[in-house]
Structures are given as structure tokens and as C-alpha cells.
Amino acid sequence: MTVATGDPVDEAAALPGHPQDTYDPEADHECCERVVINISGLRFETQLKTLAQFPETLLGDPKKRMRYFDPLRNEYFFDRNRPSFDAILYYYQSGGRLRRPVNVPLDIFSEEIRFYELGEEAMEMFREDEGYIKEEERPLPENEFQRQVWLLFEYPESSGPARIIAIVSVMVILISIVSFCLETLPIFRDENEDMHGGGVTFHTYSNSTIGYQQSTSFTDPFFIVETLCIIWFSFEFLVRFFACPSKAGFFTNIMNIIDIVAIIPYFITLGTELAEKPEDAQQGQQAMSLAILRVIRLVRVFRIFKLSRHSKGLQILGQTLKASMRELGLLIFFLFIGVILFSSAVYFAEADERDSQFPSIPDAFWWAVVSMTTVGYGDMVPTTIGGKIVGSLCAIAGVLTIALPVPVIVSNFNYFYHRETEGEEQAQYLQVTSCPKIPSSPDLKKSRSASTISKSDYMEIQEGVNNSNEDFREENLKTANCTLANTNYVNITKMLTDV
């Protein structure tokens, strides 16, 4: 710290909340001390009263900032990010306004906020300004056994056995999906019509409907595979339910709802097959029951969403869609307006054409959707000049409509992607920390005679020597890997010896 005033004054008088005195804004002679802060070679100069506005922060508390004092140069030295300090100093000058410089990444600026100890309120304000979405708190069960089981099934990265369970779960999901797809192949189906009885599989086809009706055989390999998969899904679901910290919140989780949807169709199908009577085929009820079963069995395909529990990519996609619901709603609304307008326009443009492919406005909805989304399926095309002009305008309007909300959705995706990878990057790159070494008393006397520091600074250093040696010794033991080459603190003893 460099004192620019002629007479040193007690810095304690300029700090609000100090046990000896209080800060008086009317006393200008007590607030004219100026300090120099060196940020990796870039010097900033400000007044003590500016820093004293936030006494709980690193720069506002004399005890906290004294460890970074360089008595030889009479300044404070911080080996930190230089562009970020412009915003940090402005935070003090403006009385609490925090704005991130455009050339500073989000994660770096967040680390600077934590380093200078601006507080949780400043961090929350910064996150709100940057559009951060507050992460939901995930409580753990209080019971130790339930906590271990919950971590085992809910957090695959928590341990080796948890990873093994996650791998097994993924394999079972994939087997279930593959089985669901393979059982529809003609090679695995009996296409004899009106065969029923003894649990034999049968299928019915018609000219208007392409499909199959299947009666489950308990010896069928696909049924056995399906049963084994359901056993695992049910076991996994029940274990999660009994180990979860909140039973009520368990059923509000979208992932648990997907688990229920993946399990229920099997038991409904099994119950229907067991309750089916042979005379139902003659009563005309079998067709309806099989149609319902076909819809229920279709729900099995949603098991693929169970993979999102073990895939960060799918989780990021889901979070992006959830955060972009407003933009997606606007997109659908714009498309709806465009479909109505261009369907009506192309219908009236083609009304006089004898071979018109647009017999009504609702029939033109499909063409408008395909054109606005730039798919261009080609099953319905306008033939008149007016219809082609409407089609051209429809395609151009579709491109503009879809392009408007895309940047917002991409921005949300980038945010969630960087937030997911931030933890991994922090684990790989350790932040350089400072070694809090307190100089000895003789060195302090020499440094005080060799350089100009304020009375309050000297008192803080002397107090640290007398009262904090043990605390800093313990901290040094914890940070034994910290060397002089990577420290923010200046070794005063070595500097005076060199001089």
C-alpha cells in the first residue's frame, strides 16, 4: 500500500464496524489515504474510503489484505487476472454494482469474485445478470445406509460399484429397446390369420391397416427377455424409492416418471393376456383390446429416455429444452400463424384449378408445415403462378421464423454445456493459492524504516506477528506444496536480504 498523504493516519478510524472507532464520512482528513494495488504488474490506485465500504471483503478488511503487502514497493500485490480487476474495483467505486468485462470468461470472473470475497450476494447478483439458472438443491438421506444406497443408484460417478450398476442399467435398457424393435421383424412373426389358442402368436392384416396383433406366449424368447428387463427395472425403481430422501418429491422427478411409464405397460399387457377369454374373439371385443394393447406397448419405446439418467448429453439437451420453453412456444405460435395464412392463400390461389391438390384449407395444412420447415416433401405442390408465389413466400417466411429463436436456444445449450464441464475442468486445473507467511518482527522494523506505510498498516502487521503465527503455521502445513515460485505473498525477509 502506498500512502499518498503527508501525515499518516490511523486506518482503523476509516473502517466501519472497527471495535476502536467508526467511520465518519464528514472527516475528509481521515479518508484521504490512497492505496496502490498491483495486479500482475498492472497498478491501480484508489482511496481507503472506497475499499472501506465493504469491510467484509478481501480488499476492505486490513487484516485480510495485509498478507499481500509488499513493503519494498509500498503496495499490495496480487497475482490474479488483470482484466477482471477493472470490474472488481468498480464494484467498490459504485457501491456494489458488478459487471463482468466482455473479454473475461464466466468461470474466470466467478473465481475472481470468490478470491476477493465479495460475498454470496454479489455472486448471486452476477449470476442473475448473466442469466444463470439457479441449480436445484439435491438433498441426501439422513440415514447412513440409505445415503450409501442412494449414491449407489443415483450418482454413478460416486464410486466404482455405482459405475458398475450404471453400466448394467444401460445394458438392460439397450437390450429392452433392441428386443422391442426385433420382435416386429417378419422373420419372428407368425403371419397366419385367425390363429389363436394355447398362447400361440398370431397377426391379422387388412388392406387399410398395416400392423400386427400379438398374443403373448410365456415361452416366447422376447417375452422372457422382456420379463428379465422388467425385473431389473422394477428392482431399480423400488430401491430408489425406499432410499430416496423425499418420498413426495420422488414422484415429481421426471426421470422417475419415465421409469414408471417404462414398467407399467408390461404389467397391463400381462394382466390383459391372463384375463382374456377364448370367447372374446367371437364377441368382437378382442379387436378393441388388442388395439389398446398396441398403444400401451408402444409406450415401451419411451424407455430410451431412461438413458438420460446416465448420459450427460441427454441431460444437457433436456435442460436446454426446458430453459427454452418460452422461445419454443413463440416458434410454434409463429408457425401456427404462418400455416393458417399460407394454407388459406394457397387454397384460394389454386381454387380455379381443376386438378388442384388443395381441396380445402385443412388439407393444405400439411403442405404449409412442410414448406415452412423447408422439408419440401413434394406430395402436394401448387401448379398455378399464384400458388407458386404463395409457396415461395411460405418457404422464405418459414426460414425467417425458425431462425429467430435459434440463437437463444443455442445460447442456453452453451450455458448448460459449460456448467456441466466446469466441474471437470476445475478438477484438472488447480488455482494457484497464496502462502500466508508472516514476517518476523525485526524485518518489520527494517521495512518500516525503509519504506513508508501507514500507522494502521504497521499495527495490523505487528498484530499478525504477535497473535497469528500459530494459525498461519497450521495453514502452511496444510498447503505444504506451495512454493515461493507460485505464491502471491511476498517474502519480506528475502527481499530485505537481497537489498
UniProtKB/Swiss-Prot annotation:
<comment type="similarity">
    <text>Belongs to the potassium channel family. A (Shaker) (TC 1.A.1.2) subfamily. Kv1.2/KCNA2 sub-subfamily.</text>
</comment>
<dbReference type="GO" id="GO:0005251">
    <property type="term" value="F:delayed rectifier potassium channel activity"/>
</dbReference>
<keyword id="KW-0966">Cell projection</keyword>
<feature type="topological domain" description="Cytoplasmic">
    <location>
        <begin position="1"/>
        <end position="160"/>
    </location>
</feature>
<keyword id="KW-0597">Phosphoprotein</keyword>
<feature type="transmembrane region" description="Helical; Name=Segment S6">
    <location>
        <begin position="389"/>
        <end position="417"/>
    </location>
</feature>
<feature type="region of interest" description="S4-S5 linker">
    <location>
        <begin position="312"/>
        <end position="325"/>
    </location>
</feature>
<feature type="modified residue" description="Phosphoserine">
    <location>
        <position position="434"/>
    </location>
</feature>
<dbReference type="GO" id="GO:0044305">
    <property type="term" value="C:calyx of Held"/>
</dbReference>
<keyword id="KW-0325">Glycoprotein</keyword>
<dbReference type="GO" id="GO:0019233">
    <property type="term" value="P:sensory perception of pain"/>
</dbReference>
<dbReference type="GO" id="GO:0030027">
    <property type="term" value="C:lamellipodium"/>
</dbReference>
<dbReference type="GO" id="GO:0043204">
    <property type="term" value="C:perikaryon"/>
</dbReference>
<feature type="transmembrane region" description="Helical; Name=Segment S2">
    <location>
        <begin position="222"/>
        <end position="243"/>
    </location>
</feature>
<keyword id="KW-1133">Transmembrane helix</keyword>
<dbReference type="GO" id="GO:0001508">
    <property type="term" value="P:action potential"/>
</dbReference>
<feature type="transmembrane region" description="Helical; Name=Segment S3">
    <location>
        <begin position="255"/>
        <end position="275"/>
    </location>
</feature>
<keyword id="KW-0633">Potassium transport</keyword>
<dbReference type="GO" id="GO:0015271">
    <property type="term" value="F:outward rectifier potassium channel activity"/>
</dbReference>
<feature type="transmembrane region" description="Helical; Name=Segment S1">
    <location>
        <begin position="161"/>
        <end position="182"/>
    </location>
</feature>
<feature type="modified residue" description="Phosphoserine">
    <location>
        <position position="449"/>
    </location>
</feature>
<dbReference type="GO" id="GO:0099508">
    <property type="term" value="F:voltage-gated monoatomic ion channel activity involved in regulation of presynaptic membrane potential"/>
</dbReference>
<dbReference type="GO" id="GO:0008076">
    <property type="term" value="C:voltage-gated potassium channel complex"/>
</dbReference>
<dbReference type="GO" id="GO:0043194">
    <property type="term" value="C:axon initial segment"/>
</dbReference>
<dbReference type="GO" id="GO:0030424">
    <property type="term" value="C:axon"/>
</dbReference>
<dbReference type="InterPro" id="IPR005821">
    <property type="entry name" value="Ion_trans_dom"/>
</dbReference>
<keyword id="KW-0851">Voltage-gated channel</keyword>
<keyword id="KW-0406">Ion transport</keyword>
<dbReference type="GO" id="GO:0019228">
    <property type="term" value="P:neuronal action potential"/>
</dbReference>
<feature type="topological domain" description="Extracellular">
    <location>
        <begin position="276"/>
        <end position="289"/>
    </location>
</feature>
<dbReference type="GO" id="GO:0043679">
    <property type="term" value="C:axon terminus"/>
</dbReference>
<keyword id="KW-0967">Endosome</keyword>
<feature type="topological domain" description="Extracellular">
    <location>
        <begin position="183"/>
        <end position="221"/>
    </location>
</feature>
<feature type="short sequence motif" description="Selectivity filter">
    <location>
        <begin position="374"/>
        <end position="379"/>
    </location>
</feature>
<feature type="short sequence motif" description="PDZ-binding">
    <location>
        <begin position="497"/>
        <end position="499"/>
    </location>
</feature>
<feature type="transmembrane region" description="Helical; Voltage-sensor; Name=Segment S4">
    <location>
        <begin position="290"/>
        <end position="310"/>
    </location>
</feature>
<keyword id="KW-0770">Synapse</keyword>
<feature type="modified residue" description="Phosphoserine">
    <location>
        <position position="441"/>
    </location>
</feature>
<dbReference type="GO" id="GO:0033010">
    <property type="term" value="C:paranodal junction"/>
</dbReference>
<dbReference type="InterPro" id="IPR003968">
    <property type="entry name" value="K_chnl_volt-dep_Kv"/>
</dbReference>
<feature type="modified residue" description="Phosphoserine">
    <location>
        <position position="440"/>
    </location>
</feature>
<feature type="modified residue" description="Phosphotyrosine">
    <location>
        <position position="429"/>
    </location>
</feature>
